[in-house]
């Protein structure tokens, strides 16, 4: 086969991007993965992005992978006052959804013709019909755990089954196929507000998952306890699309940031002695909780690397560390650890020999990065899917979480308790052993013949068949 014939036989896959780094990061990683598996890739973007971090990530991806094509999706004007939320990401999702009919001509104009459309999970209900209208296979890229995916699919039926939804109690449970029931106390509070824009989108998306050709999830079979094949057999019998484990989706070169000071500090620390503390880009702890966390880190007696964030998204923090923590506390902290307000290269930190534990919000991307590097976690959920993810991490044996930490219960966690939990994490040898085991399983999953590698190959072969029909 000539080089041109080989290129022509490659499937051409478009990825419809959403907004928010928690959604964008796995989409861009999946785009890079497809290129590495010899697929043509087009990403469909919309500007201006909500945050600078998003536009930067897209630009760096395109710079590192010049073979990826970008198509800009121009959105209709959208008046945010017509939506009952001020969240900039929810508003962007709605703006994209309302412009769905404009995507048809854009997809039709792409050359060579597309083999498949991969849609971010926040946009499914509006764009699966667009793909179907073009006789184009569509796939959901789900950006959280399989357990969370099953909950989102099941939630519309759960809502429909309740004659009085307002009577739901926190100790009620939601039955989800293939998994243990989800306590309502672990469900994001916004799910329980049926008048909220997010919940409207959630229910519509959950109903539309079944209309896609497959649901791609950043996970691997060993992390799921080997239950995915059985779940997919049942889904096939019920006429539902399969859960396709395509993870772990690895961090790419374009994600690296220049921040050498923390790494230099880590180089001087003993192996496995440092707890890394970071709560992601989407949520900021209150100033009171930041002070208690600082006190807890000191009380733990452990070395630590702490990324302090007091503003949401990628806004610059105006308060200095002195103002946030107080000069006396900051001086004590400097004796034990390294504190930084800038973002760090999380992959480089987690991969460092000195890091032996991770205090995290439980975002799925961060959780999968910890799995990849074999770092046990203390999960402190803050919002969204993070309590569900904490359950997954705990059941996998990779981490621990305190159920009364987070929304709906204890509002301010005191430093004394934080310190004790960090000591528990850093002294837990079974967690370390399990983390190393899952680290090896994660690598096996994407090697030739691994569970995720085989799944991806099967997808690509199916897309090649679509290419030959066009």
From Swiss-Prot:
UniProt temperature dependence: Optimum temperature is 45 degrees Celsius.
Instruction: Please name one Pfam family that this protein belongs to.
Output: UDPGT
N-terminal signal peptide: none
Q: How does the record characterize pH dependence?
A: Optimum pH is 9.0.
Q: What is its EC number?
A: 2.4.1.-
What Gene3D superfamilies has UniProt attached to this entry? Answer: Glycogen Phosphorylase B (3.40.50.2000)
Write down the top EC class of this protein: transferase
Question: Which InterPro entries does this one have?
Answer: UDP-glycosyltransf_plant, UDP_glucos_trans, UDP_glycos_trans_CS
Q: Recite the UniProt keywords alphabetically.
A: Glycosyltransferase, Transferase
Keyword Zinc in the entry? The reply is: no
User: What GO terms are given for molecular function?
Assistant: UDP-glucosyltransferase activity; xylosyltransferase activity
Instruction: Tell me the superkingdom of the source.
Output: Eukaryota
Spell out the SUPFAM superfamilies in the cross-references: UDP-Glycosyltransferase/glycogen phosphorylase
Role, per record: Benzophenone C-glycosyltransferase involved in the biosynthesis of mangiferin. Exhibits a robust regio- and stereospecific C-glycosylation activity toward over 35 substrates from 18 structurally different types with UDP-glucose. Also able to produce O- and N-glycosides and to use UDP-xylose as sugar donor. Generates only C-glycosides with 2,4,6-tri-hydroxy acceptors at the A ring, both C- and O- glycosides with 2,4-di-hydroxyl acceptors at the A ring, and only O-glycosides with 2- or 4-mono-hydroxy acceptors at the A ring.
Q: Which family does the UniProt entry place this protein in?
A: Belongs to the UDP-glycosyltransferase family.
Name assigned to this protein: UDP-glycosyltransferase 13
Per the UniProt entry, what species is this protein from, by scientific name? Mangifera indica
């Amino acid at each position: 086969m000539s080089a041109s014939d080989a290129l022509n036989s490659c499937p051409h896959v478009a990825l419809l991007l959403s907004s928010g780094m928690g959604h964008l990061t796995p989409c861009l990683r999946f785009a890079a993965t497809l290129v590495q598996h010899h697929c043509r890739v087009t990403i469909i973007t919309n500007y201006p992005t909500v945050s600078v971090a998003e536009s930067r990530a897209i630009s760096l991806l395109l710079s590192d992978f010049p073979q990826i094509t970008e198509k800009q999706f121009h959105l209709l004007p959208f008046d945010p006052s017509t939506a009952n939320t001020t969240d900039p990401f929810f508003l962007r999702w709605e703006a994209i959804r309302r412009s769905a009919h404009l995507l048809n001509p854009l997809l039709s104009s792409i050359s060579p013709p597309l083999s498949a459309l991969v849609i971010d999970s926040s946009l499914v209900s509006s764009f699966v019909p667009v793909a179907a209208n073009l006789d184009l296979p569509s796939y959901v890229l789900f950006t959280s755990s399989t357990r969370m995916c099953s909950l989102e699919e099941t939630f519309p039926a759960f809502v429909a089954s309740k004659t009085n939804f307002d009577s739901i109690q926190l100790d009620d449970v939601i039955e989800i196929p293939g998994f243990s029931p989800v306590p309502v106390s672990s469900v994001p509070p916004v799910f329980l507000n049926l008048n909220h824009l997010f919940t409207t989108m959630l229910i519509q998306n959950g109903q539309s998952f079944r209309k896609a050709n497959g649901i791609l999830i950043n996970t691997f079979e060993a992390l799921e306890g080997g239950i995915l094949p059985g779940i997919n057999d049942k889904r096939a019998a019920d006429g539902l699309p399969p859960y396709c484990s395509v993870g772990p989706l690895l961090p790419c070169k374009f994600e690296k940031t220049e921040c050498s000071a923390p790494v230099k500090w880590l180089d001087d620390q003993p192996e496995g002695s440092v707890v890394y503390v970071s709560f992601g880009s989407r949520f900021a702890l209150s100033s009171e909780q930041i002070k208690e966390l600082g006190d807890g880190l000191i009380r733990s007696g452990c070395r630590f690397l702490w990324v302090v964030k007091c503003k949401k998204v990628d806004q610059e923090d105006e308060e200095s560390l002195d103002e946030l923590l107080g000069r006396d506390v900051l001086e004590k902290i400097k004796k034990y650890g390294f504190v930084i307000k800038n973002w760090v290269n999380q992959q480089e930190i987690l991969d460092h020999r000195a890091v032996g534990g991770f205090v995290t919000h439980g975002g799925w991307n961060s959780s999968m990065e910890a799995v990849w590097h074999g770092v046990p976690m203390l999960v402190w959920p803050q919002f969204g899917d993070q309590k569900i993810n904490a359950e997954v991490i705990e059941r996998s044996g990779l981490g621990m979480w305190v159920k009364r930490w987070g929304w709906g219960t204890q509002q301010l966690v005191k430093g004394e308790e934080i310190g004790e939990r960090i000591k528990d994490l850093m002294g837990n040898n079974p967690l370390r052993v399990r983390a190393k085991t899952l680290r090896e399983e994660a690598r096996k999953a994407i090697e030739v013949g691994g569970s995720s590698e085989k799944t991806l190959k099967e997808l690509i072969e199916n897309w090649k068949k679509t290419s030959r029909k066009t």
